[in-house]
């Protein structure tokens, strides 16, 4: 019997304009009315999820930042974290600078970027499609490295947007050799960097252990590379028609 449904957001639960259809909303409400836990599982922080998800009655837990934070909505705290130390974050930011990337840092449930680059979003081909969203949701700081160092805590995720499309496979190959991190992509031309072993599947595993729910009683649905680990973990999985996680190479991103 299904006790928990883990749902990717972009491309799965949400429509292209970042909202949930009435049909999907009603289906989730019906599942929750029957006692099933509905858990958003996303590369975003909880704060950056659209309000139609955050404010959905009955949402108790969320897997955020690709599993780096498992958030208890009602208690307003993380019940599990898998974070990167400053040294790893600084290394990833230096790496991104080598390829003139637009970097983002996810820390304590918020997304940060460099103030000096915020007005240059349109220069990044893949990022330019989300320029208005980025400018309205990212918190700008003078120096990401200094900000992380001063924060004195681990980082959930580093998100790199390459300026040149041809740099993506080169960067991907180099990062695959780094044993300190796990990498994935949500299909938008970005490279999402987490602590080694951190992914949506790991976050879902720890949530299930916390709730004492067997994986056989879990359903997961997703459509992209970063959904693969949780689809493999769940007893029942629903892969959307545009699923990319089985792609042999990131060259088409």
Give the predicted meaning of each segment.
Residues 35-39, 59-60, 157, 216-217, ...:
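Short active-site oxyanion
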Residues 245-250:
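Conserved small/polar residues in nucleotide/adenosyl-binding loops
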Residues 37, 102, 182, 236-237:
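Residue-level detector of anion-binding/catalytic polar loops
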Residues 43, 219-224, 239-240:
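Glycine-rich beta-to-alpha transition loops that act as phosphate-gripper elements at the mouths
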Residues 3-16:
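Asp-based phosphoryl-transfer active-site loop
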Residues 31, 66, 204, 230-231:
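Hydrophobic residues within well-ordered alpha-helices
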Residues 22-126:
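Active-site phosphate-binding/coordination module
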Residues 95, 106-221, 225-227:
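Conserved acidic, metal-coordinating active-site core of Asp-based
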């Amino acid at each position: 019997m299904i006790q928990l449904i883990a749902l990717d957001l972009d491309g799965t639960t949400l429509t292209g304009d970042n909202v949930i259809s009435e049909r999907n909303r009603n289906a989730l409400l019906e599942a929750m009315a029957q006692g099933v836990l509905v858990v958003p599982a996303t590369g975003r922080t909880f704060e950056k999820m659209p309000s139609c998800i955050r404010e959905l009655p009955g949402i108790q837990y969320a897997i955020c930042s690709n599993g780096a934070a498992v958030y208890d909505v009602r208690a307003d705290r993380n019940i599990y974290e898998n974070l990167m130390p400053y040294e790893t974050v600084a290394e990833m930011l230096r790496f991104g600078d080598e390829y003139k990337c637009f970097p983002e840092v996810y820390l304590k449930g918020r997304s940060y970027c460099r103030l000096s680059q915020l007005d240059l979003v349109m220069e990044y081909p893949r990022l330019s499609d989300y320029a208005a969203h980025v400018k309205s949701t990212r918190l700008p700081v003078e120096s990401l490295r200094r900000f992380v160092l001063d924060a004195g805590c681990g980082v959930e995720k580093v998100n790199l947007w390459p300026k040149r499309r041809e740099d993506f496979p080169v960067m991907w190959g180099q990062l695959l050799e780094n044993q300190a991190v796990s990498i994935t992509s949500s299909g938008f031309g970005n490279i999402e960097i987490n602590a080694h072993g951190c992914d949506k599947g790991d976050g879902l595993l720890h949530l299930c252990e916390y709730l004492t729910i067997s994986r056989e009683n879990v359903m997961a649905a997703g459509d992209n590379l970063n959904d693969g680990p949780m689809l493999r973990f769940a007893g029942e999985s629903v892969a959307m028609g545009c699923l990319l996680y089985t792609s042999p190479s990131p060259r088409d991103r």
